[in-house]
């Protein structure tokens, strides 16, 4: 087991906002920071970049679309650290609006990574989360636009305090199926797979927070979703108005909430402010 028992993990951390979050955690978090990437060479290059800046991250390969890869990471964290203190679920995919890929394929691939794989990360790693742990799920303000463009019936379901994880999974599966059957608009869905995927992540964060409050309240584990804002990354494009360092501020703020904090919990946070939606 590592001589340092505290550990923070950032997924999709070889570039962009994930790398910026890992960099800032290396500076501020009291413990080891493990950055992950699907591509080993790119992940190790990111580690070398941070080492050149005088920081000391660790690297572990992770493909969040692969459940066995997630479980290998879980076993590593359990063996090396006895668990996990901070989880930042940043890894995601986004298609450009002019991408010629069929809409239903975009929907399936986007939901697979952004929602279902993120859910797998939470379900595999929350059981080893230590007391006062912090889970930060990177969402997007596009989730709010997606919500506004949902039918009233779907809005009520997403807002419901009794919505279960299983119910949410069924809704996300239905969106994918409705796109395949070319009926998603008629069924009340918006035309944004990315927005729907991040809406799912935001609602999942609320459901997981509620479950933790019911089953592990004394551990004070906080789960929140956040929007970094329009950041200059490969995903958001060069014309976005924020640097990756600015985009990392709210995720890092949530990751480093003090041990006695009880809120925010299960919220969507933008610019360190809870969003009402």
Curated annotation (Swiss-Prot):
Q: Which reaction does it catalyse?
A: a secondary alcohol + NADP(+) = a ketone + NADPH + H(+); a quinone + NADPH + H(+) = a quinol + NADP(+)
Manganese recorded as keyword: no
List, in alphabetical order, the GO biological process terms annotated in this UniProt record. Answer: cognition; phylloquinone catabolic process; xenobiotic metabolic process
State a single Gene Ontology molecular function. 3-beta-hydroxysteroid 3-dehydrogenase (NADP+) activity
Q: How does activity depend on pH?
A: Optimum pH is 5.5-7.
Localization per Swiss-Prot or TrEMBL: Cytoplasm
Q: Does the keyword NADP apply?
A: yes
Q: Where does NADP(+) bind?
A: 10-34, 38-42, 63-64, 90, 194-198, 239
Gene3D superfamilies referenced in this protein's UniProt entry, alphabetically: NAD(P)-binding Rossmann-like Domain
PTM sites of type Phosphoserine: 30
- Report residues binding substrate: 140
Residues bearing PTM N-acetylserine: 2
As annotated in Swiss-Prot or TrEMBL, what is the tissue specificity of this protein?
Answer: Detected in ovary, pancreas, intestine, colon, kidney, brain, thymus, lung, heart, liver, spleen, leukocyte, prostate and testis.
The record's annotation in Pfam families points to: adh_short
Identify which residues the record assigns to the active site.
194
Q: Which GO terms describe its cellular component?
A: cytosol; extracellular space; nucleoplasm
Enzyme Commission no: 1.1.1.184, 1.6.5.10
InterPro entries registered for this protein in UniProt: CBR1-like, NAD(P)-bd_dom_sf, Sc_DH/Rdtase_CS, SDR_fam
Q: What is the effect of changing residue 244 to M?
A: Increased carbonyl reductase (NADPH) activity; exhibits a 2-fold higher Vmax with menadione; higher Vmax with NADP(H); does not affect Km for menadione
Instruction: Give the record's keywords alphabetically.
Output: Acetylation, Cytoplasm, NADP, Oxidoreductase, Phosphoprotein
Q: Which family does it belong to?
A: Belongs to the short-chain dehydrogenases/reductases (SDR) family.
Purpose = Catalyzes the NADPH-dependent reduction of carbonyl compounds to their corresponding alcohols. Has low NADPH-dependent oxidoreductase activity. Acts on several orthoquinones, acts as well on non-quinone compounds, such as isatin or on the anticancer drug oracin. Best substrates for CBR3 is 1,2- naphthoquinone, hence could play a role in protection against cytotoxicity of exogenous quinones. Exerts activity toward ortho-quinones but not paraquinones. No endogenous substrate for CBR3 except isatin has been identified.
Please report the name of this protein according to its UniProt entry: Carbonyl reductase [NADPH] 3
Q: Which organism is it from?
A: Homo sapiens (Human)
């Amino acid at each position: 087991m590592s001589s340092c028992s505290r550990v923070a993990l950032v997924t999709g951390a070889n570039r962009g906002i994930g790398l910026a979050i890992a960099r800032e955690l290396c500076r501020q978090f009291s413990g080891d920071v493990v950055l992950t990437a699907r591509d080993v060479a790119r992940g190790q290059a990111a580690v070398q970049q941070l080492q050149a800046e005088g920081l000391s991250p660790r690297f572990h390969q992770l493909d969040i679309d692969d459940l066995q890869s997630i479980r290998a990471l879980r076993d590593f964290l359990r063996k090396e650290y006895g668990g996990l203190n901070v989880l930042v679920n940043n890894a995601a995919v986004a298609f450009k609006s002019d991408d010629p890929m069929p809409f239903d394929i975009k929907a399936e691939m986007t939901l697979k990574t952004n929602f279902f794989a993120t859910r797998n990360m939470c379900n595999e790693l929350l059981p080893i989360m230590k007391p006062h742990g912090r889970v930060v799920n990177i969402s997007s303000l596009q989730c709010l636009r997606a919500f506004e463009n949902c039918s009233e019936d779907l809005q009520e379901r997403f807002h419901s305090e009794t919505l279960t994880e299983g119910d949410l999974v069924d809704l996300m599966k239905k969106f994918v199926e409705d796109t395949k059957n070319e009926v998603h608009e008629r069924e009340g869905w918006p035309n944004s797979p990315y927005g729907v995927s991040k809406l799912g992540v935001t609602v999942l964060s609320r459901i997981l927070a509620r479950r933790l409050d019911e089953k592990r309240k004394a551990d004070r584990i906080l789960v929140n979703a956040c929007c970094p804002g329009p950041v200059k990354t490969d995903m958001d494009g060069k014309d976005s108005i924020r640097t990756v360092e600015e985009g990392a501020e709210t995720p890092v703020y949530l990751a480093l909430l003090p041990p006695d904090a009880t809120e925010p919990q299960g919220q969507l946070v933008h610019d360190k402010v809870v969003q009402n939606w």
